[in-house]
Amino acid sequence: MPLLDSFKVDHTRMKAPAVRIAKTMTTPKGDNITVFDLRFCIPNKEILSPKGIHTLEHLFAGFMRDHLNGTEVEIIDISPMGCRTGFYMSLIGTPNEQQVADAWLASMRDVLLVKDQAQIPELNAFQCGTYTEHSLAEAQQIAHNVLERGVSVNKNEDLLLDEQLLSL
């Protein structure tokens, strides 16, 4: 089985919260696709709560589009990582890390402005697979933590995994 790009970086050296360009590609028609690693937590030291990350997923996707989409950028998808330390964001375009960090911080401020659970989008049995597993308070705590700590940049060249460690 081929080794995925996300497992070629040393998770023990990742900063968080931090933005990383995880992958870039060009489609046959010439569109640039960029995948960002939006790391909320330091891997193996912190983790996002299930209800918090789920609520954040519902809020973050819309808020990031509000702050980042434009004539040169269109978000395709924002999805939580299985390890619950962050999100992957795939988009058309090539915004830089600072543009993404600024949109992320603005989105976290928006999360703090949500007044109650009734304002969480798609919070119903028809649009959400586990609509009872949400916590606005936990999502807002995550947002507060990001704003308090700020968002830095993780560079792939600083995180390259030593090939000797790949066989462990």
From Swiss-Prot:
Give UniProt keywords alphabetically: Autoinducer synthesis, Iron, Lyase, Metal-binding, Quorum sensing
Single Gene Ontology MF annotation = iron ion binding
Q: What's any GO biological process attached to this entry?
A: quorum sensing
Q: How is the cofactor bound?
A: Binds 1 Fe cation per subunit.
Q: Does the keyword Iron apply?
A: yes
Which residues are listed for Fe cation binding in this entry? H54, H58, C128
Q: What class of enzyme is it?
A: lyase
> Could you tell me the EC number(s) of this protein?
4.4.1.21
Q: Which cofactor does it need?
A: Fe cation
Catalyses:
S-(5-deoxy-D-ribos-5-yl)-L-homocysteine = (S)-4,5-dihydroxypentane-2,3-dione + L-homocysteine
Description of how the protein assembles with itself and partners: Homodimer.
**HAMAP family reported in the protein's UniProt record:** LuxS
Job of this protein: Involved in the synthesis of autoinducer 2 (AI-2) which is secreted by bacteria and is used to communicate both the cell density and the metabolic potential of the environment. The regulation of gene expression in response to changes in cell density is called quorum sensing. Catalyzes the transformation of S-ribosylhomocysteine (RHC) to homocysteine (HC) and 4,5-dihydroxy-2,3-pentadione (DPD).
Q: What protein family does this chain belong to?
A: Belongs to the LuxS family.
This protein is called what?
Answer: S-ribosylhomocysteine lyase
Which species is the source of this protein? Pasteurella multocida (strain Pm70)
Q: Which gene produces this protein? A: luxS
